[in-house]
Structure formats: C-alpha cells, structure tokens
Regions:
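The feature marks the mature, well-folded catalytic cores of soluble enzymes
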Residues: 1-293
Length: 293
C-alpha cells in the first residue's frame, strides 16, 4: 500500500510538501498577503527559498520520499503548511474544512494531487463542520485525539469519527483554550508533539488536565517545553523515526531535554518559513505513509 499514516512516529516513508516558490510565488505576493494573514513579519522570499531547501534536505536524508504539491493560483501563502488541509487514514485521505477563507481551496488541491498518485479519497468534512490536520494527534493506530477549538469544531469531529468508522476504536475530543483568540492559530499540535510511542513533547500550560493525565496513564513520558521557547515553536517537532526528529533552531533548552532522552535532533532555520507564519516542521509536512518495517 502506498499510503497509511495512523501514527506519528514510525519511519516517515512518503511526505507531501509545498515549496515556497509555489506557495509564496514572489516577494510582491509575500508583501501583500503576509499582513492579510496576520503574519508576525514579512518573510524574505529569497531566504525562504534557501531555508526551505535545507529543510527539504533533512526530510530526504531521513529516507523519506518527498513529493511536491504544485502551485495553484487559488491558494495563499499559508498553503506552504500542507499538514492542515487533509488527514491520511489507512482508508484514504480525509479532506478537511478550513476555518480561514484564504485556505478554503487548499483541500481541493490536495484531492487533485492524491488522485493523481492513486491515493483514494475516503471523504471530506462539510460545513458547518470544521476540521484541520493540526488538531489531529494519533495516539496509536486505533486511537486519535482531536483538538476542539476555533479551527476544528464538534461537528467536524463528529464527521471525522463517522468517516473513520471501524478504522479506529476511539476518537477523543480535546477542548482547546481561547488563548490569543480566534484570529491566532492554536491547534492541538501547537501543544503536543509525539517523539516516540512512549515520549511526547508538550506545553502543559495549554493542555486540559484530563488529556494530560490520559497520556500519563498510557505510560507516555511528557517532556516539558519551557515558557521562553513556546513562541519560538519549541513544541512543534516532527518525528521522522522514533526518537529522531526535526525542529526549529534556537530552542536550546527543549533540544537539550530531547537529547537527554537519547533523541537525535536535526534543526533548520525557521525564521522565514516557520516563525513568521506560525507553522513549524509538522505544519510544513503532510506525511502520507509511515511504516513499522
């Protein structure tokens, strides 16, 4: 099978990304759209291209087969964050329903690409449901947690559960806080990054007590991200194999805590492609095949 991704730590075999040359297009487009999309700064287009090449190289050196989502005139800068518009189940792709109007066309571009490589579409979330990939955390192959907040709502989670059917045993709804409001992106994965089946990186101050305790009761060790490294996206880390990950450089405390747990850490410069648009290495990638083999 050329797809299947109901876990977040087994070896990354196939991943879909979108290069900034296609998502950003040029500096003029970046200048215009970054304010519209509430970016914290205006990305430098040329530096973004160079930094993304380094990020792509890390993915390829991990052994992943890297696929590129083509450019599309209907999409905006945020289309670089390919994790959000769809979810890959063992039954096919589930197309999400995005909250922001600038991202509404993105699931359709995912659908076209996956169909072109013969990956089935299991279904789609429809209004009034909302669901974004950044809110979905696979605890194991048959257990998935979904953040319920401003980006994914109860109706979206209900539809997701219905589409998955017998592919899972449990879908856990995790309430998210208001934090900085509906115009700022907060996903469940803003606060949780699986590093191994029994090791998660977390920012506990934004986790519900019940969900945090649930993880502990499952025997998962929680590594805490310090306050000073939360805004620099220290909690957004992509596992490419168990205990081998990619993270944004400039989070030395978090990196040290990972390395103390025998985690191999690779870093990249996220100043343009991650920090200004609030999308770390998990956001930049849509894994669509992980394998235990």
């Amino acid at each position: 099978m050329n797809f299947g991704c109901q876990n977040m730590v087994d070896p990354l075999c196939k991943v879909l990304i979108k290069h900034p040359r296609d998502a950003y297009q040029n500096q003029t487009t970046v200048n215009h759209q970054s304010t519209q999309l509430n970016y914290t700064g205006v990305p430098n287009f040329e530096k973004a291209l160079a930094d993304y090449e380094s990020f792509k190289d890390l993915l390829e050196s991990s052994g992943a087969d890297v696929h590129f989502l083509p450019g599309d005139e209907s999409t905006f800068l945020d289309s670089i964050y390919t994790h959000d518009p769809c979810i890959i189940s063992n039954g096919g792709a589930i197309l999400c329903a995005m909250r922001e109007k600038e991202r509404l066309s993105e699931p359709g571009t995912m659908e076209a690409y996956f169909k072109s490589i013969n990956i089935p579409i299991l279904g789609r979330i429809i209004s009034p449901g909302m669901l974004e990939g950044g809110d979905v955390v696979w605890i194991d192959e048959y257990t998935v947690a979904v953040g319920e907040g401003y980006r994914s709502n109860a109706e979206g989670i209900r539809q997701f559960r219905e589409l998955l059917g017998k592919l899972v045993n449990e879908v856990i709804s995790v309430p998210l806080p208001h934090w900085n409001g509906p115009d700022r992106c907060l996903h469940l994965m803003s606060n949780v990054s699986p590093i191994d089946h029994d090791l998660y990186l977390v920012y506990s101050r934004l986790l519900p007590v019940s969900f945090r305790q649930y993880l502990i009761n499952r025997g998962i060790k929680l590594l805490e991200v310090p306050d000073e490294e939360y805004n620099s996206m220290g909690c957004n880390v992509l596992a490419v194999t168990p205990r081998k990950c990619i993270m944004i450089e400039g989070n030395p405390v978090t990196q040290g805590r990972l390395e103390a747990e025998k985690v191999k850490v690779h870093t990249y410069d996220g100043s343009e492609i991650s920090l200004k648009g609030a999308g770390g290495p998990t956001c930049l990638t849509r894994p669509f095949l992980r394998s235990t083999a």
